[in-house]
Amino acid sequence: MDTGIWKVYGPVPEDAFGFIYEIVNITNGKKYIGKKQMKRKIRRLPLKGKKRKRVDYKESDWKTYTGSSDALNIDIATQGLDKFVFKILKFCNSKFELSYFEAKEQFERDVLLSEDYYNGIINCRIGKPPKQLLEQYYNQ
């Protein structure tokens, strides 16, 4: 599978919804931790005679995505893509997993307290996990 600018260590799961990533500036060592959805929801008109809208998924721009940090994107524009390493740390199967593991990774690395990171905010809104995920977690 073509992964664009991203380095992947291991196979890309077919059912992956998104991933947690790290971008490293080779010149100064600064890093950025974030998440990206690989699929996006498309709402379509209902079929003739039906009332409910249809939901489809389409591949997002993840292969060329460079993060949402303004400071990071300015550095990428001025220094060039070749001065950065784009690594996928973990694949996730749901929005909940994506938000949870991004926040977990950011808190474990103290991204807001360190000058070594581009991250300026940990923006996360997480509810109760799906029962299926809890069962997986407790059965490991």
Question: Predicted regions span which residues?
Answer:
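Structure-specific nucleic-acid interaction/processing domains
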Residues: 1-140
